[in-house]
């Protein structure tokens, strides 16, 4: 007697070949960018180890420091009173290089094979991350060494984001893009969490390993990328998606930001892409100015500048804030800071779902930004009153701060990079993504720098700066929110008209 089909085999057959390949690409690019973020996180965990109060620690027998020196166990040159400014300079070296490199990276990403470009970037990123940690074992105490390594790492890390967004955009159409990319974008928070946990293992003993281990993992992932990344569905005989609906159904002006893909009604069917692999002449890569003329690019880019300023200030300074204000150990502060990233995962998925359901990317971002401002104020004043309040407030702040950031860098970037005004030229995706994330990276560089300069005057002032940036991010979306509200009224009017008929 023959048995019935095994449940596992039944499950495998339930999905088409195209679905399996799409799932594989989604998972692979998820792991790729998680590694990028994992390699960025250790510096925020190790900061509290580079400069610490050593007054209660037992001095080694051969110590030559002055008996009144309370920073004898800190790592020179970060053992002086200006350590916050020096740590801010190290952060900013990476972030400024990243911001500058991002504008160039998108141009290269449109013109070079993504597999080579991405895998080379990951291997180099792993190398420079490890070199930072080797400064501990090589007993390097020169500021220029750490700054130079951060600059090089910032430049090579720009290979990541435009490449993975372009690759995912090649495989997935517009249908449920916000939800899919909301889940996928959790790689940012997953990478931050992994980076925090891995760095926390060695931060109190050999902090150099906090960089070397993530660096090695990132380099290995670069080799895996070279072996397995598939740029286009056509490369493995899969069906390419379409990015737009039937033109006859588009009754409104496609140049209107309300009717652009980030705010249009998304169908459940995969839509999409004319890719460069299709038959016929290959479309030219879009110019920088051409990408800026796409409706919505400038507004969302400037909004992301301030949203990313807030997010990256938390990324780089939250563990030190918890260490100084709540008086946890370096490892406990690093572990607790991961809750902000847990909230970021939830926020990214929520923002994607809500924007898909309401067809309103800008309004979703604006509402979350409005709610984030009072939550940051409350976290600063009551978040450290107990472990329970700290956990709850960190998760809520993570949801509201990282939700808009996640939505803009994923679904919005993909929507604008395949805008109707491009007339089927999907080669704009990497450039648009680079412009949006590059502009955001300027804010990412400014945030930690300002935090380093302002924190000596008190942490309250740092939070006032973050709240101000959050409000500015919201204001920059007002025009698009107004357009989306008009679109809702029009849609409701049509719906009422149909019911009367």
Curated annotation (Swiss-Prot):
The chain crosses the membrane at residues 19-39, 88-108, 118-140, 142-164, 179-199, 210-230, 303-323, 334-354, 362-382, 391-411, 434-454, 462-482. GO terms for molecular function: glucose 6-phosphate:phosphate antiporter activity; glycerol-3-phosphate transmembrane transporter activity. One of its GO terms (biological process) is phosphate ion transmembrane transport. CDD domains: MFS_SLC37A1_2. It is a multi-pass membrane protein. It is found in: Endoplasmic reticulum membrane. Highly expressed in bone marrow derived macrophages, and weakly in spleen. GO terms for cellular component: endoplasmic reticulum membrane. Glycans are attached at residues 53, 62, 68. Keywords: Antiport, Endoplasmic reticulum, Glycoprotein, Membrane, Sugar transport, Transmembrane, Transmembrane helix, Transport. Induction: Up-regulated by cAMP in macrophages. InterPro entries: MFS (IPR011701), MFS_dom (IPR020846), MFS_trans_sf (IPR036259), SLC37A1_2 (IPR044740), Sugar_P_transporter (IPR000849). Coiled coil: none annotated. It catalyses: D-glucose 6-phosphate(in) + phosphate(out) = D-glucose 6-phosphate(out) + phosphate(in). Residues 240-252 have a biased composition (Basic and acidic residues). Inhibited by vanadate but not by chlorogenic acid. It comes from the Eukaryota. Residues 240-266 are annotated as: Disordered. Inorganic phosphate and glucose-6-phosphate antiporter. May transport cytoplasmic glucose-6-phosphate into the lumen of the endoplasmic reticulum and translocate inorganic phosphate into the opposite direction. Independent of a lumenal glucose-6-phosphatase. May not play a role in homeostatic regulation of blood glucose levels. Belongs to the major facilitator superfamily. Organophosphate:Pi antiporter (OPA) (TC 2.A.1.4) family. This is Glucose-6-phosphate exchanger SLC37A2. It comes from Mus musculus (Mouse).
């Amino acid at each position: 007697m023959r048995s019935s089909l095994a449940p596992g085999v039944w499950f495998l057959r339930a999905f088409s070949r195209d679905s399996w390949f799409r799932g594989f690409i989604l998972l692979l690019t998820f792991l790729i960018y998680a590694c990028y973020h994992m390699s960025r996180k250790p510096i925020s965990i190790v900061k509290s180890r580079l400069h610490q109060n050593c007054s209660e620690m037992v001095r080694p027998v051969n110590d030559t420091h002055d008996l009144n020196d309370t920073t004898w166990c800190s790592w020179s040159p970060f053992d002086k009173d200006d350590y916050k400014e020096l740590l801010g300079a190290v952060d900013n070296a990476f972030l400024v290089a990243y911001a500058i490199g991002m504008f160039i990276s998108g141009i290269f990403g449109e013109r070079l094979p993504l597999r080579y470009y991405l895998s080379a970037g990951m291997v180099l990123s792993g190398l420079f991350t490890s070199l930072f940690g080797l400064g501990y074992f090589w007993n390097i105490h020169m500021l220029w060494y750490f700054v130079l390594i951060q600059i090089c790492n910032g430049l090579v890390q720009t290979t990541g984001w435009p490449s993975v967004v372009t690759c995912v955009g090649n495989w997935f159409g517009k249908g449920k893009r916000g939800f899919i990319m909301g889940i996928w974008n959790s790689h940012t928070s997953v990478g931050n969490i992994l980076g925090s946990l891995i760095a926390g293992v060695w931060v109190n003993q050999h902090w150099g390993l906090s960089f070397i281990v993530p660096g090695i993992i990132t380099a290995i992932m670069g080799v895996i990328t070279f072996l397995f990344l598939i740029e286009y569905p056509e490369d493995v005989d899969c069906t390419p998606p379409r990015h737009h609906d039937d033109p006859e159904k588009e009754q409104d002006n496609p140049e209107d930001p309300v009717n652009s893909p980030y705010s249009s009604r998304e169908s459940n069917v995969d839509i999409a892409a004319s890719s460069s692999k299709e038959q016929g002449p290959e479309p030219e890569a879009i110019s920088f100015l051409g990408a800026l003329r796409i409706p919505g690019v400038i507004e969302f880019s400037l909004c992301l500048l301030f949203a990313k300023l807030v997010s990256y200030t938390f990324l780089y300074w939250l563990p030190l804030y918890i260490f100084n204000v709540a008086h946890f150990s370096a490892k406990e502060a690093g572990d607790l800071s991961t809750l902000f990233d847990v909230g970021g995962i939830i926020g990214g998925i929520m923002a994607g779902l809500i924007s898909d359901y309401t067809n309103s990317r800008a309004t979703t971002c604006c509402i979350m930004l409005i709610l984030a401002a009072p939550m940051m104020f409350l976290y600063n004043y009551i978040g450290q009153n107990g472990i329970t309040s700290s956990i709850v407030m960190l998760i809520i702040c993570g949801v509201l701060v990282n939700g808009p950031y996640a939505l803009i860098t994923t679904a919005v970037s993909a929507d604008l990079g395949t805008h109707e005004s491009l007339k089927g030229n999907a080669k704009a995706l990497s450039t648009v993504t680079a412009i949006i994330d590059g502009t955001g990276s300027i804010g990412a560089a400014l945030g930690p720098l300002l935090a380093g300069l302002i924190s000596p005057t008190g942490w309250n002032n740092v939070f006032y700066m973050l709240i101000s940036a959050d409000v500015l991010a919201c204001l920059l979306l007002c025009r698009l929110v107004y357009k989306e509200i008009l679109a809702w009224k029009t849609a409701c009017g049509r719906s009422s008209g149909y019911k009367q008929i």
